[in-house]
């Protein structure tokens, strides 16, 4: 089993691991000795990622899953439980989507999709994983939240609402599941350099909004996925055994700025 500062022998499920933040988390956990299972909606992306990870000697498996589907979430957890023989040390609820609109312009379909993937899936997978996390005798759940769960970010009303709900779920599960030796924490990214951000800044107004956020950061730059992944790994280390119920922001100092 793992020492205080590594994850040797641990098992992990990371949702949405084929790109961006999720990809960075899979790499970080695997490089520290964990056996990782991940999922994505895109089979080709998963195949490409698996080739890269296996060339590095990482222990990673993956399958396609549409997390907006309750039945596919159940199937995913059954697969993971079988793969890891009924024990799971780490669940990272990373998968999420954002649709940029003013609050009054969201359709019912927009709202349902964002809620189902960002919040409902994270809650459902956590509940499904509970017996396997408990069986490991040292379980960890990490929710990938956002500064948008605490700040009013333009065109992210529904996205921000899902992250705010996620933060409260983090605190509640931390209390409910402590008796089962399961710690629950959240990591809130600021502006992280991912393909999603690259797509977003193609829109001039969104680029301006993004630059305003970066200007509010003490470090005056975007973060890298590996910088956020390092915090996720820390929270899963035995060395973090007294940390639970926390939302930790990896945001270059954005949340520390009161607006001046």
Swiss-Prot record:
Quaternary state and interactors: Homodimer.
Metabolic or biological pathway, per its Swiss-Prot or TrEMBL entry: Alkaloid biosynthesis; tropane alkaloid biosynthesis
UniProt keyword annotation of NADP present: yes
Keyword Oxidoreductase listed: yes
EC number: 1.1.1.236
Intrachain S-S bonds: none
Gene symbol of the encoding locus: TR2
Name of this protein: Tropinone reductase 2
Reactions performed catalytically: pseudotropine + NADP(+) = tropinone + NADPH + H(+)
Ranges in a coiled coil: none
Native source organism of the sequence: Datura stramonium
The protein's enzyme class: oxidoreductase
UniProt record, GO biological process: tropane alkaloid biosynthetic process
């Amino acid at each position: 089993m793992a020492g205080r500062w590594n994850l040797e022998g641990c098992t992990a499920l990371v949702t949405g691991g084929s790109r961006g933040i999720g990809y960075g988390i899979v790499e970080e956990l695997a490089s520290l000795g964990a056996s990782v299972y991940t999922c994505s909606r895109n089979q080709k992306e998963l195949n490409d990622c698996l080739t890269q990870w296996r060339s590095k000697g990482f222990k990673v498996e993956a399958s396609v899953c549409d997390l907006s589907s309750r039945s596919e979430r159940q199937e995913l957890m059954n697969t993971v439980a079988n793969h890891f023989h009924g024990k799971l040390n780490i669940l990272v609820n990373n998968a999420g989507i954002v649709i940029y609109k003013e609050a009054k312009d969201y359709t019912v379909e927009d709202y349902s999709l964002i809620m189902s993937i960002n919040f409902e899936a994270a809650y459902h997978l956590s509940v499904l994983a509970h017996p396997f996390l408990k069986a490991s005798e040292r379980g960890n759940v990490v929710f990938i939240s956002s500064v948008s769960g605490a700040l009013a970010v333009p065109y992210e009303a529904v996205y921000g609402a899902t992250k705010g709900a996620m933060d409260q779920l983090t605190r509640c599960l931390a209390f409910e599941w402590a008796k089962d030796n399961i710690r629950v924490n959240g990591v809130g990214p600021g502006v992280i350099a991912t393909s999603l951000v690259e797509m977003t800044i193609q829109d001039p107004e969104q680029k301006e909004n993004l630059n305003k956020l970066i200007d509010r950061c003490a470090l005056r730059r975007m973060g890298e996925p590996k910088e956020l992944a390092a915090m996720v790994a820390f929270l899963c280390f035995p060395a973090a055994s007294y940390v639970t119920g926390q939302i930790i922001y990896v945001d270059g100092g954005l949340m520390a700025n009161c607006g001046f």
